[in-house]
Amino acid sequence: MPLGTTLWYYHKVEFIESQPFTRKLHRLADDGADQVLRAIQQDLERKPDRGAMVPGLGCVRKARIANPGRGKGKRGGYRYLYLYLETRQHIHLLLLLDKNEQEDASEEQRKQIRHWAAQLKRDAGD
């Protein structure tokens, strides 16, 4: 009897960081930037749609991640806004906020995010 073969495909998502996200990550987390980024990636690899949709931002989601330097858990940590494009398995990390500095995106940031989201979805065919 021939040996059967079963193929399993594990869908990994690709992460794309915006320049504002990366700059803010390195400014806020400094030496812990890689640790924070990896924690975000692990959370989103497990459940890409985990964050709550932000009204008016074109399918952009907002989630929380702990600040390892503060030791206060997710509530006292960072907020990040991202766009998950399921058809392409892309997650665009758009903005990172420190709760102590800014809890929500400013109107100017929201305008930029709406523009990015529309452009990214259009480019992806979503």
PLM regions: where:
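Enriched for short, Lys/Arg-rich terminal
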Residues: L3, L83-D126
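Amphipathic alpha-helical interface surfaces
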Residues: E17, V36, I40, K74-G77, ...
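Arg/Lys-rich, positively charged N-terminal/basic patches that mediate binding to nucleic acids
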Residues: M1-A39
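Solvent-exposed amphipathic alpha-helical surface segments
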Residues: L28, K47, L120-A124
